[in-house]
């Protein structure tokens, strides 16, 4: 499955103006892939992962990563591939940003300026993995 990265980025940037990183990343990927799930269900699935888990901006994993991991699971049919991709998604993000922790990336939620770029970066990685 080939995902159009330009459309993917546009969707994520649009959603990120009013949704969380986990919601924006999951929805951008699933919509670009035409995955059959409603926006409402994607938001319900992803909303608890916002702000490093429940909006705590604490030690929880960045929502861009959790959104990407959820999309990876939906867009792949093979469980071993999903697990291998998950490890690659996690490690790629950590290598790029030095951490996967929301609190470290956002200064405990005080600076969300890196968020949209984090979402786009990791969503494009998922697109590459899905295209394999």
Region roles according to the model:
Residues 1-4, 26, 31-49, 94-100:
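Acidic-glycine-rich active-site phosphate/pyrophosphate-binding loop
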Residues 2-3, 82-132:
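C-terminal binding/interaction regions
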Residues 7-35:
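Active-site-proximal helix-loop elements at catalytic-domain edges
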Residues 8-16, 50-59, 107-111:
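A short glycine/serine-rich beta->alpha loop
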Residues 21, 62, 102:
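Short cysteine clusters
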Residues 33-44, 74-88:
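Phosphate-handling active-site elements
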Residues 59-67:
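Membrane-inserting effector segments that mediate pore formation, membrane fusion
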Residues 66-75:
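DPxDG-like acidic metal-binding loop motif
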